[in-house]
């Protein structure tokens, strides 16, 4: 009888301890892989998020001035890393205050990026950005952040199309960018460039499946018209269309991508993120309705000449709000398979962060006409994509 009572007590003790275990914090799922050292991260001694993790929204906050920024200088990235179109300081941008702002969530603190820690956690792994030139913008940012905070590492870079890879040899880490602006396939059919809404190319699929961490993005290319349109016809359901409602096309394309993720990605083994739409600042009507206390330069016809973020924590409108809703809906339908990096609002506040005319891609005559030539789509490096990567770092490792 005593033995039975002892076993009963032991069972109840174990049951109580098992059921009272604390849940994983927000943005921290078990990370596993076919590599033996890619295991669930132990709880850190430094508490980054509050006790009530559900109250921590990394993407709701405000921009605060921080004199310790930027995280790096462009010369620390290595030769040929930053695209000339993103290297604003090198190509003549006269102001630098836009580099002195840090994103501060309301209810939690974002860990400062630590390149050595990142490489230790990602040893023997491949991190792959997949998407358009905004994905490239973020890829180059992460390379710079790693190179500046772990300066003694041996590296090698391969620039190819569609796949470019930055290798950190000491840790056997690969940070890659796969160019796929629509995510779905685009190919010649009967002599016409065709956007195939129901297909992802075999080459893309094979490349993506080699990654341990995937971060996808798409958006801007779906709304391009005229000479900027990247296709001549669309194909879906075995039928061809000269055009269709772009949001319908985006929804179909993302449905194809979603099916691919659910079919080929083993969630416990591979982490998948999706970057929400990165806003543009070409239309001054989006910000002229703001209060007179706004810090924005009035009268501008684009992002040119803007040197400070929007004051406040909200942005009145955006030309990409409908695209964002489509992306949000698709990702939410996938539940735990994909984590949404909802950077749209925090980025919309950074009208000051674009290259404008300070781009190595513009000749002098184009720079003399900023209202027509300014790049208000991409972002300066150093700059806003560094914040995207700090949030990515927090979501991935904490």
Curated annotation (Swiss-Prot):
Bilayer topology: Single-pass type II membrane protein
One Pfam entry name: PMR5N
Has the keyword Membrane been applied to this entry?
A: yes
Which stretch carries the motif DCXHWCLPGXXDXWN motif?
A: 375-389
InterPro entries attached to this UniProt entry: TBL, TBL_C, TBL_N
Q: Which GO terms describe its cellular component?
A: membrane
Looking at the UniProt entry, the stretches that span the membrane are: 1-21
Keyword annotations for this protein, in alphabetical order, are: Membrane, Signal-anchor, Transmembrane, Transmembrane helix
The protein's location, in the record's own words, is: Membrane
UniProt short sequence motif GDS motif, positions renumbered to this chain: 131-133
Q: Name one GO molecular function term.
A: O-acetyltransferase activity
The protein's job, in short, is:
May act as a bridging protein that binds pectin and other cell wall polysaccharides. Probably involved in maintaining esterification of pectins. May be involved in the specific O-acetylation of cell wall polymers.
Family to which the UniProt record says this protein belongs:
Belongs to the PC-esterase family. TBL subfamily.
A further note on this protein reads: Contains 2 motifs that are conserved in esterases, but it is unlikely that this protein belongs to the catalytically active pectin esterases.
What protein name is recorded for this chain? Protein trichome birefringence-like 45
What organism is listed for this UniProt entry? Arabidopsis thaliana
Name of encoding gene: TBL45
